[in-house]
Amino acid sequence: MLSRRTFLEIAAASGLAAHLGCSVGPPAKKRKKLAIIASIWKYLSHAQHFGDRFLVGYPRKGRWHHPEMDVVSLYVHQKPEGDQSQARADEFGFQVYPTIREALRCGGDKLAVDAVLLIIEHGDYPRNAKGQVLYPRYEFFRQVVEVFEQDGRAVPVFNDKHLSYDTAKAKKMVADSKRLGFPLLAGSSLPVTWRIPAIEFPLDCVIEEALMVGVGSSDASDYHALEAMQCMVERRRGGESGVKSVQLIQGDAVWKAGEEGRWSKRLLEAALSRSNKLLGDTLIDARPQDLANNGQLPKIVKEPAAYFIEHADGLQSTLLMLNGGVQDRTFAAKLQGEPEPQSLLFQLPPIPNVTYSACLAEKIEEMIETGEAPFPAERTLIVSGILDHCLESKVQGNRKLETPELQISYRPPEGSHFCRA
């Protein structure tokens, strides 16, 4: 039992500690410092989506969540009309620096941040003959790595979307992270957004065939669709084993390939059964449609494309880009031992809130707090390489290409990382 004298001694000590500015409880957690390296920061740019979530927070598990970290520095490569970078800096008290090195060192001579967010998406950049936007992700990443090397310290890095449009450059980025020992999280929000239904394949399941339906432009939206498909098929027996060959075909050849069985009409039916945004006759009189089987797709999809991926372990996966047929992204696969395909919709909430960005912000925050990326950068690496080689197939007359460069194997995370309702 606590005596009065002992109680008074404890109380007096506590009061003295408080008077001296000390804490008698556990020390306050030190807030992490973030540097953002961006192509642009304006309304609806990716830098705005992710940057704002670290500045003002985001919804998580029924509450408004404020990350226990601060944006302290920013570098923006371009400042077009509508630029928000300086306004955000003024409002939230961080500095916009003229170079990447200064942003990482906060104007000093040593690395002064605990993590780097590399968000090089959107902006005015040229395209090459394959239609790839030449975003300087690799070049900016290299500047970050050079600071790590010069200052003798490396911190976690998030890279938004592709690692690079060039497979060789993308490989160097992953190699640098392993050489210097810093966690690298890369990719888009598709693997972590909501799924309807909330399906996650069991690890080491046997997938017989997979098909993804995507929409949008190249090389932004086909990347999204390929990555969404990859996060599903990587959970098969043995994990990802690499890609043996790819081929991209277009136009009527896509429908002919379906008739010949190169892609599964049954899987297309299963995928489209999850779509919330069917086009064609549905827009005219609201009728339900079996677009996989009613013969309408060739009439309403003017420029179809099929991306065929032959994995090293024999799995065949296919992306169908069906602009004009649907306006959302769905997936289906046939698992061994299951009588029917499993299928789902990757749910993307609308602009301007694009809440799916919060799902990825949570994973970025997790990496910064734990020092470990929640899923491997090799997923983004292999998807970057698949897209690069599919677009090479396109410019080479849609021929099949062997891909020894894509013998990239990895194991998926054991846990499930997508948002759930």
How would you label these PLM feature ranges?
Residues 214, 224-351, 358-378, 387-391, ...:
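Contiguous beta-strand/loop segments that form the cofactor/metal-binding neighborhood of enzyme cores
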Residues 1-2:
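N-terminal secretory signal peptides
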Residues 34, 183-195, 202-218, 240-252, ...:
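NAD(P)-dependent dehydrogenases' Rossmann-like dinucleotide-binding region
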Residues 121-191:
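Beta-strand-loop-alpha-helix segment that lines the small-molecule cofactor/substrate pocket
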Residues 95-103:
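Short acidic-hydrophobic, aromatic-tinged amphipathic segments that line or gate anion-handling sites
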Residues 22-91, 210:
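N-terminal Rossmann-like dinucleotide-binding module
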Residues 6-24:
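N-terminal export signals
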Residues 117:
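N-terminal Rossmann-like NAD(P) cofactor-binding module of classical short-chain dehydrogenase/reductase
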